[in-house]
Structures are given as C-alpha cells and as structure tokens.
C-alpha cells in the first residue's frame, strides 16, 4: 500500500499486519510523524521522505522495500491539488513504470467545474498557506492517464464516495 501525501492519515496503522505500507510525504511531515509515533509499536510501515515534484523521486521508492513485482494499491488522495499538471503527469508516468499490471491507484482531483467541493478545498488550501496548482476536466484527466498507460476503472463523484466509503467509516 503506497500512501502518497500521507500526512497524518492513520489508515496504515489499522492494516499494518495485513500489508506492507509505505507512507510517502515531504521530509518535514515524515520527520514529525516519526517523532509522534516513536513510542508506537509499528510493523510493516516504512516512512519515505519524498518531494514528488522532483524528477528523481522514484529512486527513493525503488531503494526502499517496495517490490514492483507485487500488486499494490496507491492512494493519492488530495495530492493532485498541490502539483502542477506537468508535475502530476510526470509523477504518474514514473510510477506507472513500476506498478505491476492489476495494481490500483485511487485519487481525487479538483474539477474545472466549480463544484462546492472544489471551492471548499480551495478555501482550505488557502487557510493552510497553500494553493491549488491545477484543475482538471474528466476528459483531460482521462487523457493524462492514457498517456501514462493507466486506465480508469471506476469514476465516482464526491457525494457517492462519501456515502459509500467515508460516512460509515466515520460513524
């Protein structure tokens, strides 16, 4: 399980005995998370300090315990908001070379249609002194994925994802 831009997500800790987890984020986030988790018994979780906007980010992943000959799930929730379109495309292109066919990628993206969710995310980013660097149409995103040899299997809107996956998890 590759958790890109893992932040302070705790998903990995619930499933650490069932899979190997790679928490991937900026150096300062990973260092802070390591410090906060130093007294927690953590197995099968590897923290990787990676700047995904850099060309050579993939080398850090490949030098870890990541095994490209095994199926994996890559979570990139919230990531596409903070990379330029070119950075996001390059990242996907590099990653796709090292994903075993049948692996899955899960991500959300800011839409060019000014949805309520996109406006909320823009406001949250601004409050965190960040800015959203890109917005996508579905057709544009589909083309980017195609160029990276990736295929959309399922596309759901914010409301459906919340109802199916998040609501029951948080109740």
Where are each of the predicted segments found?
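Alpha-helical subdomain
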Residues: 2-171
